[in-house]
């Protein structure tokens, strides 16, 4: 009998737009959310929500909650707005990943799950565009 403890895995969902960075840590099925944090929860000024520093603080907050609940290893899913929005993650994605790695998690795989259309998307505003 080995006395080795089972490593509990989780998934870190990072949504990084130009305006904010949202972090959600869930179990492997994605059904149970273990911890949540965002750039807007950790800074006072609205203009700092999207900053790399806010993303780092949010990742540290989510990481400490997840470590308390026994998650020891993470798979990371990074997402940009996608669709008719930006297809590249915002400025907070890289610092959030780095902060999770420094928090002591074992990092499994990192994948990009940005929704990318295969034909085209009809932009909002209708045929004649947005009238200002």
Swiss-Prot record:
- Do the record's keywords include rRNA-binding? yes
One GO MF annotation is: rRNA binding
Alphabetical list of Gene3D superfamilies matching this protein: Ribosomal protein S11 (3.30.420.80)
The record's keywords, sorted A to Z, are: Ribonucleoprotein, Ribosomal protein, RNA-binding, rRNA-binding
Q: Which GO terms describe its biological process?
A: translation
GO cellular component annotations of the record? cytosolic small ribosomal subunit
What family is it from? Belongs to the universal ribosomal protein uS11 family.
Q: How does it assemble?
A: Part of the 30S ribosomal subunit.
Q: Which PANTHER family match?
A: 40S RIBOSOMAL PROTEIN S14/30S RIBOSOMAL PROTEIN S11
Question: What is the recorded function of this protein according to its Swiss-Prot or TrEMBL entry?
Answer: Located on the platform of the 30S subunit.
Q: What is this protein called?
A: Small ribosomal subunit protein uS11
- Which organism was this protein described from? Saccharolobus solfataricus (strain ATCC 35092 / DSM 1617 / JCM 11322 / P2) (Sulfolobus solfataricus)
* Lineage of the organism: Archaea, Thermoproteota, Thermoprotei, Sulfolobales, Sulfolobaceae
């Amino acid at each position: 009998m080995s006395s080795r403890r089972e490593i509990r895995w989780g998934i870190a969902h990072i949504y990084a737009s130009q305006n904010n960075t949202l972090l959600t840590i869930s179990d492997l099925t994605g059904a149970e959310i273990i911890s949540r944090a965002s750039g807007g929860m950790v800074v006072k000024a609205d203009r700092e929500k999207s900053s790399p520093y806010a993303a780092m603080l949010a990742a540290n907050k989510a990481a400490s909650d997840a470590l308390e609940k026994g998650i020891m290893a993470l798979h990371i899913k990074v997402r940009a707005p996608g669709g008719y929005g930006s297809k590249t993650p915002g400025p907070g994605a890289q610092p959030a990943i780095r902060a999770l790695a420094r928090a002591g998690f074992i990092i499994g795989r990192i994948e990009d799950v940005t929704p990318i259309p295969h034909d085209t998307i009809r932009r909002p505003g209708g045929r004649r565009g947005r009238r200002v």
